[in-house]
Amino acid sequence: MLTPETIDAFNTRLTVNLNTIKTMKPSQLDQVKSQGSNAEALLKNRDLALFIHQYKFELLDSLSAITGYTEEDNNKRVAISNQLAGIDGFVASLQRAVYMKNRVVTLQQEPTPNLKGNEVL
């Protein structure tokens, strides 16, 4: 069951896209960098990588073991495919968080030109 705390956490989550990075507050940028660093640590974790590969191999083995074409067999195929898509989506979200962190760091390191009047670069 969803609790009010869970709903509030979902509604106040930080959503980031490339168009809003330049307009974000410093606290939000720090949060993006923190989440990106955590995601990067997870992606570099060898145990997690081995677990994910083993999990996917087990799912593929169970998928190849389904030989029938009944409605129940088709439902099993769909369920296993959804599990594979879910784990791939999880890894993609980690990679996206790392990319956003790197993008924020790059934008913060770029020097801003000090232009006066109508100077042209």
Listing of model-derived features with the role each one plays in the protein:
Residues 2-121:
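Intrinsic-disorder/low-complexity detector
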